[in-house]
Amino acid sequence: MTQSIPASVQKFRREFRAKLDQQVYYGQIHVLWMLAWLLGSIVYSFCALCSVRFSEWGFLIGALIFLSFVEYWFHRGPLHKPFRAVRKFYKVHTLEHHHYFTDEAMRFYDFKDFKMVLFPAYAHALVVIAMQLLSRYFFEPAISANAGHLFAAGACLYFLLYELIHLMAHLPQDHPIFKISPLGFLRDHHKTHHRLSDMSKVNFNIAMPLFDLVFRTLKKG
């Protein structure tokens, strides 16, 4: 830990890492698992396409927009409001993630910190399975097989971008990747959300701040 990290954050991190050190966790494996499920689903969906009509590509775009809304709603709702039925989400996100990483201490330090950034491993598998079932048993009979494959690909692509951009946002401030203007913007966008006074009010989208614009919760850093 560096001297620039507030004492309260250092204390929280020490206590959390003491618990984490008692568990078997490898951040590298967590990332590989996430990539295997999400990239695997995307590749499978694209390989299954056959004679795609131009109009069917709209389901890929629609999935990206729909997942952006789901991300916004889930982040602004259950992740920041202690609803009794899903209080665990609030605990893990607001009480742990937002106290492990604040706007004054955004960066992770090693692979074990990935546990505080990535969704749990089971979530990657559940999303892929759900999207492939939706593709097969809803889109294919109701619209077309291509529509289903493109929707599933778009949904998994958005989730993949979410995870990768979230990891990126917790890189060191001076990382050269932030010289790319859109990535620097997304990093600052998320850093503002990590300000404790703002975390339940602004900047709920991470990968694509579309619905922060729609619902007027976009705040510049």
Regions found by a protein language model. Give the residues of each.
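Membrane-embedded catalytic scaffold of the fatty acid hydroxylase/desaturase
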Residues: 69-152, 156-221
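Alpha-helical transmembrane segments
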Residues: 29-36, 57-60, 125, 147, ...
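Cytosolic-side membrane-entry/anchor segment at the start of a transmembrane helix
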Residues: 1-41
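N-terminal signal-anchor transmembrane alpha helix
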Residues: 58-74
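Hydrophobic core of alpha-helical transmembrane segments in multi-pass integral membrane proteins
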Residues: 30-48, 121-138
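Helix-coil boundary and interhelical linker segments in multi-pass alpha-helical membrane proteins
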Residues: 43-59, 136-150
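Short hydrophobic/aromatic segments of transmembrane alpha-helices and their interfaces
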Residues: 14, 54-62, 150-153, 180-181
